[in-house]
Amino acid sequence: MKVVKLADVVEFNPEKLKKVSLFDTDNFFCDIYCLEPAQSQKVHSHGDSDKVYYVLKGSGKVTVGSDEKVLGPDENTIAPAGEDHGVVNHTQNKLVMLGFMAPKP
């Protein structure tokens, strides 16, 4: 059984969002996203996969479809398959969040 301590994998890149794979199977993946201030994940979509964003630390503007909301620690949302989605760290603090996706694209 694979066990991951999140504190051991949080890593930032001053140039762009840092994404680290935590779990990756044929059907599912979970990544940790680490964003410095002003970094973002561009808005995009996955035709057949649902994606969940879960904020661990900091806050960020999350876009799903035509909605944009600020999510903070312990808040989450889902981007259903085919919906545009993305995130931007609009604050002066670091943002750490999980991204879950299934089925894997």
Language-model regions: role of each:
Residues 50, 55-60:
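Glycine- and acidic-residue-biased ligand/ion/polar-headgroup-sensing regions
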Residues 31-46:
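Conserved short histidine dyad/triad with adjacent acidic residue
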Residues 43, 62-63, 79, 85-91:
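Short beta-strand His + acidic residue motifs that chelate non-heme Fe in jelly-roll/DSBH
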Residues 1-28, 42, 63, 77:
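A short, N-terminal "cap"/entry segment at the start of jelly-roll beta-barrel domains
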Residues 67-81:
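Short acidic-glycine-tyrosine-enriched beta hairpin
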Residues 28, 59, 67-69:
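Well-ordered beta-strand scaffold positions
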Residues 82-105:
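Ligand-binding loop in jelly-roll beta-barrel domains
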Residues 17, 47-49:
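Compact, glycine-rich, soluble single-domain proteins
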